[in-house]
Amino acid sequence: MADMTKEEFSQSIRTYTLNMYRLAFSILRNEPDAEDAVSEAVLRAYEKLGSLHRAENFKGWILKITANEAKRIYRRNKWSSAVEWEENMSPAFYDEHHELWDAVMKLEQGHRDVIVLYYYEQCSLKKISKILGCREGTVKSRLYRAREQLRRMI
C-alpha cells in the first residue's frame, strides 16, 4: 500500500486534474457531467487510497477511477436527451487543435477513449489496456481504426 499523506494526495490530484477532466469529457461529452465525474473520482480515490499499492502508479490508478465514474454517470444519464457537446465545451481547452478535437469527439466511444489516453494523456498501450480493462491487442486495433477514421474525417 502506498503511504500517501493528505498533502501528497492533494498535490497529485492537482497534477492530474486536467488529465482526469479530458478523459471524463471524452466519455461524457458534457462539461458539467465531466466536472462531476472528476469530483466523484477524487472522492472515491480518497476513500480507496489504501488500494493504491505504489505511488508511481497514481496516474493510471486515478484515470481508471475517473473512467469508471464517467461511465457510471453516462449510464445514469443515458435515458435523458444528450445536450450537444459544442454548447458545453470550454473554448480555452482546445483552441489550437479545434478541428482535430472535433473529429476525435465524433469517433465512437472505444476509439475516442484510446485516442484521448494515448495522444492527449500520453499513456502507454499497457496502461491504456489496464484503464479500459481490455487486452493490449484490442487497444492497438482500436488505435489503428481510430487513426484511419480520423484520416478520413480531416
Where are these regions (language model features)?
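Amphipathic, Lys/Arg- and hydrophobic-enriched alpha-helical face
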Residues: I13-E31, K48, M153
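Short, small-hydrophobic-rich alpha-helical interface motif
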Residues: M20, A24, A34-A45, I65, ...
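Sigma70-family region 2
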Residues: A2-D3, E40-N57, R76-K78
